[in-house]
Amino acid sequence: MATKIACFGEVLFDVFPTHRKIGGAPLNVGLRMASLGIETQIISRIGEDEIGTELLDFVTQNGVRIDSIQSDKNFATGEVVVKLDDKGSASYTINYPVAWDKIEATPEAQSVVANSDALVFGS
């Protein structure tokens, strides 16, 4: 039987001065696991917005299942503004409130966790 990984938590865009990059610690782990051929699913929440759609497309194209990414009409997909100092050290400004703070423990999400071999969460 194949290993199954569930990742729970934030999905977002890191916004740098010159570009944006999809991120969020649980999603980063999920993307890496999927690149190794491990069946991976992310449990999170995005806004019903353009960047949420972009995020879903990217995650799907990279082999992570999105069945448990919830959609929110009231809160936006997460964005974190990243500033680098002269030495390259980063500081972060998280725009609140965002959809990932509203992830619900739906029966579907609970089933994903129950049927996985491991749960990844946190930053």
Predicted regions and their residues:
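Glycine-rich phosphate/adenosyl-contacting loop at the front of the ribokinase-like
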Residues: 1-65
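Short beta-strands and strand-loop turn motifs
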Residues: 9-11, 118-123
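Conserved N-terminal subdomain of the carbohydrate kinase-like
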Residues: 39, 43-121
